[in-house]
């Protein structure tokens, strides 16, 4: 059967509209979890204020130079802040991926679904999803740090891994290998969707500071919710595409 991107886009749009409130609630809950965890594990305001003490920002040629000019205590605070942001983001993304994929599975099975039920049903697979998303993020970030393009290619090749891990109950590394093979064979269908997702995420990041006009916490929740909705659309598309490819 010939698969066209247009038909998958149409199916994705229909599902997103029909299940919008449930997906919105899952996105909002994941955003709230991300922000709360980030706040809990982040350094205090007093500690963060120390990062500006005695660091010659204007004379630093880059990030590594800036870090080298910090005291050991400031470097520890920066590391804690980065770790808190990364950890909370990974937790939120894992819950989002599990929740959205479970919504699709439950709706496809003709069952009634709510945001809490979807997240609860995804609980057994969250540890594997967390590891998968951590490894994927690590590989993509390393690729982007090199010359950008390898990172984008890795993001495309590993895009189907979360769907395969949940739908086919694969292991973490098995889903990554299978995703690379399957995506490579269907690059014309996967690449445009992932590139559009990356572009939308980048644009949202550029305008994220405007959300802080409310309060930093509310702005962070709103920005994360929009980011989660964008990711949810991609997950729906990838799930539908994967099911069509398997037929």
Curated annotation (Swiss-Prot):
Keyword Cytoplasm belongs to the record: no
Disulfide bonds: none
Primary location recorded for the protein, binned into one broad class: membrane
Keyword DNA-binding assigned: no
Bilayer-spanning residue ranges: 20-40, 87-107, 118-140, 152-172, 187-209, 225-245
Topology in membrane: Multi-pass membrane protein
GO CC list: plasma membrane
Keywords noted in UniProt: Cell inner membrane, Cell membrane, Membrane, Transmembrane, Transmembrane helix
Pfam families named among the record's database cross-references: UPF0259
Domain of life: Bacteria
Subcellular location per the Swiss-Prot or TrEMBL entry: Cell inner membrane
HAMAP family in alphabetical order: UPF0259
Family membership noted in the UniProt record: Belongs to the UPF0259 family.
Protein name according to UniProt: UPF0259 membrane protein YciC
């Amino acid at each position: 059967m010939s698969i066209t991107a247009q038909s998958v886009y149409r199916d994705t749009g229909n599902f997103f509209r029909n299940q919008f409130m449930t997906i919105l609630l899952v996105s909002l809950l994941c955003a709230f979890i991300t922000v709360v965890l980030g706040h809990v594990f982040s350094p205090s305001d007093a500690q963060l204020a120390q990062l500006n003490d005695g660091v010659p920002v204007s004379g630093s040629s880059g990030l590594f130079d800036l870090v080298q000019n910090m005291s050991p205590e400031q470097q520890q605070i920066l590391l804690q802040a980065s770790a808190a942001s990364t950890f909370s983001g990974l937790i939120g993304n894992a819950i989002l991926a599990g929740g959205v994929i479970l919504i699709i599975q439950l709706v496809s099975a003709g069952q009634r679904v709510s945001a809490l039920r979807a997240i609860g049903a995804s609980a057994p697979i969250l540890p594997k999803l967390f590891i998968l998303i951590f490894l994927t993020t690590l590989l993509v970030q390393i690729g982007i740090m090199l010359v950008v393009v390898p990172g984008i290619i890795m993001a495309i090749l590993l895009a189907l891994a979360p769907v395969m891990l949940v739908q086919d109950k694969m292991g973490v590394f098995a889903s990554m290998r299978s995703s690379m093979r399957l995506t490579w064979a269907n690059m014309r269908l996967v690449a445009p969707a992932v590139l559009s997702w990356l572009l939308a995420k980048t644009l949202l990041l550029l305008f994220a500071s405007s959300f802080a006009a409310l309060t930093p916490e509310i702005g962070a929740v709103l920005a994360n919710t929009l980011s989660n909705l964008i990711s949810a659309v991609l997950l729906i598309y990838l799930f539908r595409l994967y099911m069509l490819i398997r037929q």
